[in-house]
Amino acid sequence: IGIPWDLDRNNGGVAILPPYEKSGNSEWYTGTANAIYQNMRYIDSYNPDYVLILSGDHIYKMDYEVMLDFHKENNADVTIATMPVPIEEASRFGIVIADDDKRINAFEEKPVHPRSNLASMGIYIFSWPVLKEALLALKDQENCDFGKHVIPYCFENDRRMFAYEFNGYWKDVGTLGSYWEANMELVDLIPEFNLYEEYWKIYTKNDAIEPLYIAKGGHVERSIMGEGCECYGHVEHSVIGANVKIGRGAVIRDSIIMCDTEIGSNVTIDKSIIAENCKVGDNVTLGFGQEKPNVLNESIYSFGLVTIGEDSVIPDGVKIGKNTAISGVTYEEDYKDGVLEGGEVIIKAGDGK
């Protein structure tokens, strides 16, 4: 694991610790802090002085060594990475109130009336004995979470807590809308989060596949396309994964299409997220009409997006509205008069039967 990033080392590397239920009284991870609690024995085996806690759904570039130096210089028990946000957006975040020396005086989890615009990034450095003591004290806390439980516990117990201020690009992509936004920002003329900076390049696994092919009559504008793609249509302001096939007459705008997906001929796709290994038939329209609240979960399936899950099939000739969700192999009879109206869903398993 981690070969493309030089993480398959004898010392260090990456270990995946997935949640699973063992015999006895163990359980699936019920919160961010509970996940660490259930792996305390693994962490203890390394006898660390410090533990760095990160979220897996954030995008940023940070030199953690600088943050660790800040933690050591202040003899901190807990250091929280923070960044300033517009005050009108501050209620979406855990908010830190710190003095001129960056010592934290208060912490508010998503306050209605925030007293500061310094937002927690969900990145923490703990001195391991302090974190271990907090996790043991909170082991019976339901859905134990760092922002809601561990940080307040440390503050209430007078731990030395400091705010490390970060001013680079950072984006939480924990929702479909923010995930779509982050991808669209990558195709800006000068992206704020630049994958190609000489001094800090972003590497990934390089599969040995054929190069991108754009056919005569095909057109690609302000987009990122992976290797192995074949484009016979028009792609604009989109992010396309590897081995995607785009048929003649297809028009794709403001969309994310993941690897190994096939798009038919004369298809129109607007503002959609299509997962891996899907098949979209000929003469299909995705993203038409007005936005309507999603009937399954309007907070998740929103932002005017069409969301199609992995291994799904969309039959020829159908029209699909905004704020919709589709998963599974679907057939013409699943679409009333050939249409899935805005806000509706089709969720199937396996072959759709």
Question: Which ranges hold each PLM region?
Answer:
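Conserved N-terminal catalytic core of the sugar/cofactor nucleotidyltransferase
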Residues: I1-I59, Y64-V66, F70, A98, ...
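A short alpha-helix-loop-beta-strand transition element characteristic
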Residues: W5-D8, R103, E142
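Conserved beta-strand termini and adjacent loop/short-helix elements that scaffold enzyme active sites
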Residues: L17-P19, A81, Y164-F166
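Glycine-/small-residue-rich active-site loops that bind phosphorylated ligands and cofactors
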Residues: S23-G24, I59-Y60, E88, K171, ...
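Short aromatic/basic micro-patch
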Residues: Y29, K61, I125, D145, ...
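Conserved core of the sugar-phosphate nucleotidyltransferase
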Residues: N47, K61-P129, E133, A137-L138
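Left-handed beta-helix
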Residues: P129, L136-K353
